[in-house]
From Swiss-Prot:
This is Extended FMRFamide-3. Keywords: Amidation, Neuropeptide, Secreted. The keyword Amino-acid biosynthesis does not apply. It is found in: Secreted.
Amino acid sequence: GPSAFLRL
């Protein structure tokens, strides 16, 4: 989900 992207 979007949260996985925010972990960059």
